Amino acid sequence: MTASILGQFFPETLFFIPMNVFSMAFCLSWLVFIYPVNWAPSRFQSIWLGFRSNILEMIFQNTSPNTAPWAGLIAGVFVLILLVNVLGLFPPYAFQSPTSNISLTYSLGFPLWMAINILGFYLAFNSRLSHLVPQGTPSALIPLMVWIETLSLFAQPIALGLRLAANLTAGHLLIFLLSTAIWLLSSSLMISVPILIIFILLFVLEIGVACIQAYVFTALIHFYLQQNI
C-alpha cells in the first residue's frame, strides 16, 4: 500500500522510464493520426475534422476570424489534456496523470501564454501597452495601475497551470482516500458498500471534472488569444 497519501503523485517507472512519459507519448500519438497530411483522411480523421469544425465552434462561440487559424492548436491542446486527465483517473493510477503535476501544467501553459503575448505585442504594440492603463484612470494612479496590470498579466500563466493541477490533485486525493477506506473496511459490508457507492459517484464526477478542466484550460488560452489578436 502507498506509504504516503501523496505517494501516488510520484511517478512509477518502467524500464527506468517514468510512467508520465508513457502517458504523454500515448496521448500525443493520437494527435499524429487525427491530422491528415498528404493522403485521404480516414474515417477517424473525418470524425476529428467534424469535431474541430462543429463542436469547437459550439464551445468557443465568440471565435473571431483572426483566431480561426488557431482552432487546430486549441483543439489539439483540448484533446491532449482531456486524454491525459481521463487516463489518470483509472486505478491503479498506472499513468500517474501528468496533468496533476504542476511542472507539466506550467510547461504546457507558459509557452502558449508567452507565444500569444509575444504575437500580440508584435502585431499591436501600442494597443497592448494601452491595456496596462484602464480607460479613465486618474493621472496620479497611472504608475500604480501599470504595476498592478503588469503583475496580473504575469499571473495569468501561473493561474493557468495551478488551476489545472490543483483541481486534478484534489480529485485524485479524494479517490485515493475512498479507495483506501474501501480496502481497509472490506470486511464490513455495512460500511464498505455505502463508501463504494460514494466512490463510484465521485469517480463519475471526476470524469466530468477532467473534461471541464480541459475545457477551462483551452477556453483561457482562447481568451488570451482574443485579447492579443
Swiss-Prot record:
Q: Which GO terms describe its molecular function?
A: proton transmembrane transporter activity
Where does it mainly reside? mitochondrion
> Which compartment or compartments is the protein found in?
Mitochondrion inner membrane
This protein's record includes keyword Membrane: yes
Origin: domain of life: Eukaryota
Membrane topology for this entry? Multi-pass membrane protein
Q: Name one GO cellular component term.
A: mitochondrial inner membrane
The protein's matches in InterPro entries, at most eight in alphabetical order, are given as:
ATP_synth_F0_asu (IPR000568), ATP_synth_F0_asu_AS (IPR023011), ATP_synth_F0_asu_bact/mt (IPR045083), F0_ATP_A_sf (IPR035908)
Give yes or no: UniProt keyword Lipid metabolism. Answer: no
Which UniProt keyword terms apply here?
A: ATP synthesis, CF(0), Hydrogen ion transport, Ion transport, Membrane, Mitochondrion, Mitochondrion inner membrane, Transmembrane, Transmembrane helix, Transport
Q: Name one GO biological process term.
A: proton motive force-driven ATP synthesis
**TM spans (from-to):** 14-34, 70-90, 105-125, 140-160, 164-184, 189-209
| Recorded family membership | Belongs to the ATPase A chain family.
Q: What does this protein do?
A: Mitochondrial membrane ATP synthase (F(1)F(0) ATP synthase or Complex V) produces ATP from ADP in the presence of a proton gradient across the membrane which is generated by electron transport complexes of the respiratory chain. F-type ATPases consist of two structural domains, F(1) - containing the extramembraneous catalytic core and F(0) - containing the membrane proton channel, linked together by a central stalk and a peripheral stalk. During catalysis, ATP synthesis in the catalytic domain of F(1) is coupled via a rotary mechanism of the central stalk subunits to proton translocation.
Q: Note the subunit structure.
A: F-type ATPases have 2 components, CF(1) - the catalytic core - and CF(0) - the membrane proton channel. CF(1) has five subunits: alpha(3), beta(3), gamma(1), delta(1), epsilon(1). CF(0) has three main subunits: a, b and c.
Under which name does UniProt file this protein?
A: ATP synthase subunit a
Encoding gene (name): ATP6
